[in-house]
């Protein structure tokens, strides 16, 4: 999203916005060269591409473009596809689990949270923060082996609680996509409120919304300056 002029031009013609740009392995992780294995688009991050530039700064650019095209009428919706694990910082168990992650995954979640906070502070937009966990389809062989492990563990967590309750079920990409569309079309979808559209032949999905209360003080100050 480096071409802000083009982005602003396209935003002026849009009724709604979805930000789903992301990467699991950035350049600073030292694993960027194998990001194509986890990427749905088989992408390899460019030199200098970090979680902050790809997931946070691009969200800021989209919000700015959307705001510049506002006509003073109804707020246009913007859905940001975040991550369920961004909520880990809101519980003691989640904080412990996050502390055990590799450093680069901690930076991944921090970038998601900072993007969420930045978007929530944007005026003139109805911001929805969609928080699915791992997504899959039958063509992505890298993530499919996790399916028979994660989903049963998540189901046990829902029933009995404990640490397994922090695991969110893996969802098929089209289920998340349909839920995002439903959030765009639901004028009441905003802020700290779950949206649970029931999709035909699909499990229900909760898109948990938050104001990202657990980003660092330094990040809060930086975001305030941006706003």
Residue ranges: model-predicted function:
Residues 1-72:
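NAD(P)H-binding glycine-rich loop region in Rossmannoid oxidoreductase-like domains
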Residues 22-23, 82-85:
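Short, small-residue-rich loop/turn micro-motifs
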Residues 76, 85-199, 217-220, 224-227:
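Oxidoreductase cofactor-interface core, primarily capturing Rossmann-like NAD(P)-dependent enzymes
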Residues 202-206, 212, 216:
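Intrinsic disorder
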């Amino acid at each position: 999203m480096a071409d802000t002029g083009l982005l602003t031009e396209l935003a002026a013609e849009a009724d709604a916005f979805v930000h789903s740009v992301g990467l699991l392995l950035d350049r600073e992780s030292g694993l960027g060269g194998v990001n194509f294995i986890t990427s749905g688009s088989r992408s390899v991050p460019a030199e200098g591409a970090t979680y902050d530039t790809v997931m946070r700064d691009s969200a800021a650019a989209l919000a700015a473009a959307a705001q510049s095209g506002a006509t003073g009428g109804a707020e246009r919706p913007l859905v940001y596809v975040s991550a369920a694990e961004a909520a880990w910082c809101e519980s003691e168990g989640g904080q412990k689990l996050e502390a055990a992650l590799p450093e680069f995954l901690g930076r991944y979640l921090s970038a998601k949270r900072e993007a969420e906070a930045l978007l929530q502070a944007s005026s003139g937009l109805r911001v929805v923060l969609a928080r699915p966990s791992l997504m899959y389809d039958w063509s992505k062989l890298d993530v499919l082996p996790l399916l028979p492990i994660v989903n049963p563990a998540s189901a046990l967590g829902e029933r009995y609680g404990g640490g397994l309750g922090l695991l969110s079920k893996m969802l098929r990409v089209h289920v998340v996509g349909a839920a995002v569309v439903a959030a765009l079309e639901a004028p009441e979808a905003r802020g700290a409120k779950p949206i649970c559209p029931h999709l035909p032949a699909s499990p229900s999905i909760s898109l948990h919304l938050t104001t990202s209360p657990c980003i660092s003080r330094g990040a809060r100050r930086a975001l305030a300056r941006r706003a």
